[in-house]
């Protein structure tokens, strides 16, 4: 081996050594527990305010929301994680009653350029796709009482990230 090659490798070996000696605890596999929190909502004569959080573990912090029929709903979706929307995007899509969630989510896969929102009439309202640290607020009203399903349409998320909005 050429002695000059040995000298060129010294900085590389030194850098590898320093990186490997970093004094950080070993990363452990994560675990999580789904906790049902009481829905934080504020009702006034004019509107119901709902704050829904999503995170890098592909979870909404609430799976059950409620509001009154005919009353304005102001919903804010927060992505409390750190991963960008290209890899861990989240949105809130409120489906019309009796829409098949699986069929809707599979169709949504074909609409990447539209933030995974199909160009059909199977949903009532949606937020934009959010990356870590982003938020979006939407305002809407539902006249008909019933139970409406909401989902995140980012690929692979809808099976875990869904819940129900009960309109009384």
Question: Model regions: which residues?
Answer:
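Beta-strand cores of secreted/periplasmic/IMS beta-sandwich domains, seen most often
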Residues: 63-87, 93-94, 136-144, 149, ...
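C-terminal motif of bacterial Sec signal peptides marking the signal peptidase cleavage site
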Residues: 18-20
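Sec-dependent signal peptide recognition
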Residues: 6-13
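Short, Lys/Arg-enriched N-terminal segments with co-localized hydrophobic residues
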Residues: 1-4
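N-terminal edge beta-strand
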Residues: 43-72
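Extracellular/periplasmic metallocenter environments
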Residues: 27-37, 78, 122-168
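The feature marks short-to-medium sequence segments in extracytoplasmic or secretory-pathway proteins
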Residues: 90-120
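Bacterial signal peptide processing site
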Residues: 22-24
């Amino acid at each position: 081996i050429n002695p000059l090659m040995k000298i060129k490798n010294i900085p590389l070996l030194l850098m590898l050594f320093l990186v490997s000696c970093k004094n950080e605890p070993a990363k452990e596999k994560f675990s999580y527990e789904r906790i049902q929190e009481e829905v934080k909502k504020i009702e006034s004569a004019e509107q119901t305010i709902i704050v829904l959080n999503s995170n890098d573990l592909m979870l909404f912090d609430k799976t059950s929301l409620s509001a009154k029929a005919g009353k304005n709903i102001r919903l804010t979706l927060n992505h409390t994680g750190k991963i960008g929307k290209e890899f861990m995007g989240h949105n809130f899509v409120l489906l019309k009653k009796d829409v098949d969630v699986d069929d809707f989510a599979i169709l949504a896969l074909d609409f990447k350029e539209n933030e995974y929102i199909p160009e059909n009439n199977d949903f009532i309202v949606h937020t934009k796709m959010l990356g870590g640290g982003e938020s979006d607020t939407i305002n809407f009203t539902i006249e008909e009482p019933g139970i409406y399903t909401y989902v995140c349409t980012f690929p692979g998320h809808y099976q875990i990230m869904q819940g129900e909005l009960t309109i009384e």
